[in-house]
């Protein structure tokens, strides 16, 4: 099964109305050269409408950086999947390491957010990854498999999981300038693919696996050569249109 590669740009808590407008204009101008790879941007919540209005007639998708596990109610500061659907979000990032570490999100909460997104027809990008301490203790595979296992257990309707994306983001490589080598990343991606295959062969073949960890134009091409890497979750480089588009072009050429 041919999986369409995806390059997702997580803007985190960056941007202003003006800078977002400039970035969107540059991305719209440059994305026409991409024939195979899909680009998606993930702005802060307050810029979702701006992205929707700018990108609705382009080939660029958009989504949110988080979603509530709850449908509605007295949850101050939360944003529901139904609200994201109102802005035609195609994707939502769940379980990012910054949410897990700084906000104490558990595997069970991440799985509940996945379920909430799927119920509203939004494709979750499920982040998994290990700390440097866990890597040094040779716990990488056990950690990421447990993170994904909880999602699969709490969302056991396999048909509903079609369209989900899994992003491996080694925590020790995020915002540090470090990055996993292509072979290190491929080892984890192959393990994730095998775990999915044990659950369901069709699910394993259709699920896109992204690498996220200081992805830049100078290391992206080598990552995309790996058989189980279907794209990237890009942080800082996604805030610069030229860099983000170059990563997209490298992804486009590799598939």
From Swiss-Prot:
Q: What does this protein do?
A: Involved in the gluconeogenesis. Catalyzes stereospecifically the conversion of dihydroxyacetone phosphate (DHAP) to D-glyceraldehyde-3-phosphate (G3P).
What residue ranges carry the coiled-coil annotation?
Answer: none
GO CC list: cytosol
Please name the PANTHER family in this protein's record: TRIOSEPHOSPHATE ISOMERASE (PTHR21139:SF42)
Q: What is its main location?
A: cytoplasm
What keywords appear on the UniProt entry?
A: Cytoplasm, Gluconeogenesis, Glycolysis, Isomerase
Q: Which GO terms describe its biological process?
A: gluconeogenesis; glyceraldehyde-3-phosphate biosynthetic process; glycerol catabolic process; glycolytic process
Any Pfam family hit: TIM
Instruction: Quickly give the catalysed reaction.
Output: D-glyceraldehyde 3-phosphate = dihydroxyacetone phosphate
Record note on quaternary structure:
Homodimer.
EC number(s) for this protein? 5.3.1.1
- The protein here is known as Triosephosphate isomerase
Entry superkingdom: Bacteria
Question: Sorted alphabetically, which InterPro entries does this protein's record hold?
Answer: Aldolase_TIM (IPR013785), TIM_sf (IPR035990), TrioseP_Isoase_bac/euk (IPR022896), Triosephosphate_isomerase (IPR000652), Triosephosphate_isomerase_AS (IPR020861)
The cysteines joined by S-S bonds are: none
Q: Which family does it belong to?
A: Belongs to the triosephosphate isomerase family.
């Amino acid at each position: 099964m041919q999986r369409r590669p995806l390059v997702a740009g997580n803007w985190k808590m960056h941007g202003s109305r003006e800078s977002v407008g400039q970035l969107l204009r540059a991305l719209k101008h440059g994305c026409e050269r991409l024939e195979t790879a899909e680009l998606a941007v993930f702005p802060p919540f307050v810029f979702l409408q701006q992205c929707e209005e700018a990108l609705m007639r382009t080939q660029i998708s958009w989504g949110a950086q988080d979603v509530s596990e709850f449908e509605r109610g007295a949850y101050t500061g939360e944003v529901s999947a139904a609200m994201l659907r109102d802005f035609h979000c195609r994707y939502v990032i769940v379980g990012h390491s910054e949410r897990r570490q700084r906000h104490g999100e558990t595997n069970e909460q991440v799985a509940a957010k996945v379920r909430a997104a799927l119920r509203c027809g939004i494709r979750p990008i499920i982040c998994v990854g290990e700390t440097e301490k866990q890597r040094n203790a040779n716990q990488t595979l056990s950690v990421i498999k447990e993170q994904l296992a909880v999602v699969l257990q709490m969302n056991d309707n396999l048909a509903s999981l079609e369209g989900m994306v899994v992003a491996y983001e080694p925590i020790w490589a995020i915002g540090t300038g470090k990055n996993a080598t292509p072979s290190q990343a491929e080892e984890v991606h192959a393990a994730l693919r095998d775990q999915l295959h044990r659950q369901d062969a069709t699910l394993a073949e259709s699920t896109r696996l992204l690498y996220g960890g200081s992805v830049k134009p100078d290391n992206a091409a080598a990552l995309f050569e790996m058989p189980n890497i279907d794209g990237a979750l890009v942080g800082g480089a996604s805030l610069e249109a030229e860099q983000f588009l170059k990563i997209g072009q490298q992804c486009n050429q590799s598939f």
